[in-house]
């Protein structure tokens, strides 16, 4: 293994974290719980480490104001695309200029093997697009690499290395000059991560990517402005689900099952339907998998009053897929085809959305 890209290297790290002689960083509770569960449910697939964590992303954020009201928000969440339509009304007699931001989550490259990035674009890694009254409204993107509170972006650029090494910009650490490698290690940008098959030292990136996207938006007086925003979500995935009866009844997984039931408001009726499909076999003979989406909703409370009309549509991608989440004040309005719809009037979000989808994919 003399030439290895970040993705291949990360795969090796993921495998090593489940081995007794692997690197020292502790695997997540999810992986540790599954390792324990192997002793009591030996049929859990060896591919358990194929799980990927979702990033929590929301819609657009605006500076808190009493001059602009959100007339309506129409949010549609699917596994391949999230889209939001906002209608804003300037309630004053003069133009109001607000800073519009799309907060992208931090990416800790030391944990990159566990994160689902929807795009290989190192800058716009969720392929977001924004329109105002039907016309493209680009946001200015600023991206920085940080080690603790230290900005190391200039050093990476000096060494002609990408801030976010994904897609065509992957880094082959073994191809770097020894002096460059040594400098990155000394400055805390590379961390030792075990040995390769031929005995060479392997490294993992040690910096965090912080990305912000902003623009200035003018809201004319006494009129409505339509803002549309869409992007590809970061979707968490697992090749099985611990909510299958043979696994959720394992004492070793009790804490994780309880977390699932709380975070996704999993009801007994949901589990009963899951049991019908999964059966009671130790093996995942029905080939059920999980998909998870997190959506930051609480930022919708930044307006002059509540959101007057709110609609949420969830599209799991198939009528045979089970969906569970905590609706809070949202009321189910209809189910059309594959989609579920929820609505609320005078809505003030007080919690974010965490959506669980179980089925075949």
Residue ranges and their predicted role:
Residues 1-29:
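N-terminal secretory signal peptides that target proteins for export/translocation
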Residues 3, 43-46:
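Non-catalytic, low-structured ubiquitin/UBL-interacting segments
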Residues 10, 29-31, 101-105:
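Proline-rich low-complexity regions
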Residues 23, 37-38, 288, 296:
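Intrinsically disordered, low-complexity regions enriched in Ser/Pro/Gly/Gln/His and often acidic
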Residues 27-29, 37, 60:
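Short non-domain terminal segments
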Residues 32-42:
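Bacterial N-terminal signal peptides
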Residues 46-361:
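Lumenal/extracellular ectodomains and adaptor appendage modules
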């Amino acid at each position: 293994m003399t030439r290895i890209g970040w993705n291949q290297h990360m795969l090796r790290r993921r495998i090593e974290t489940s081995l007794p002689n692997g690197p020292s960083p502790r695997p997540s509770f999810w992986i540790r719980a599954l390792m324990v569960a192997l002793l009591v449910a030996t049929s859990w697939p060896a591919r358990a480490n194929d799980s990927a964590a979702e990033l929590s992303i929301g819609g657009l954020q605006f500076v808190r104001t009493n001059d602009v009201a959100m007339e309506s928000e129409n949010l549609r969440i699917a596994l391949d695309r999230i889209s939001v339509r906002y209608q804003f009304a300037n309630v004053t007699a003069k133009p109001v200029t607000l800073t519009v931001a799309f907060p992208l989550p931090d990416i800790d490259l030391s944990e990159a093997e566990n994160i689902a990035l929807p795009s290989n674009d190192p800058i716009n890694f969720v392929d977001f697009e924004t329109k105002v009254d039907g016309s493209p409204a680009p946001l200015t993107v600023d991206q920085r690499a940080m080690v603790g509170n230290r900005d190391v972006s200039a050093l990476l650029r000096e060494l002609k290395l990408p801030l976010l090494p994904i897609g065509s910009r992957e880094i082959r650490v073994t191809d770097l000059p020894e002096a460059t490698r040594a400098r990155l290690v000394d400055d805390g940008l590379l961390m030792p991560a075990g040995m390769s098959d031929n005995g060479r030292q392997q490294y993992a990136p040690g910096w965090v990517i912080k990305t912000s996207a902003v623009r200035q938006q003018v809201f004319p007086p006494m009129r409505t402005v339509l803002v549309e925003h869409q992007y590809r979500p970061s979707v968490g995935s697992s090749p099985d689900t611990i909510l299958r009866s043979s696994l959720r009844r394992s004492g070793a997984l009790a804490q994780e099952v309880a977390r699932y039931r709380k975070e996704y408001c999993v009801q007994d009726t949901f589990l009963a339907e899951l049991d019908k499909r999964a059966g009671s076999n130790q093996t995942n003979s029905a080939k059920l998998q999980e998909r998870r989406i997190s959506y930051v909703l609480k930022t919708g409370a930044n307006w002059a009053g509540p959101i007057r009309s709110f609609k949420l549509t969830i599209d799991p991608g198939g009528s045979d897929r089970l969906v569970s989440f905590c609706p809070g004040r949202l009321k189910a309005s209809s189910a059309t085809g594959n989609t579920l719809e929820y609505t609320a009037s005078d809505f003030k979000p007080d919690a974010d959305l965490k959506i669980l989808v179980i089925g075949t994919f």
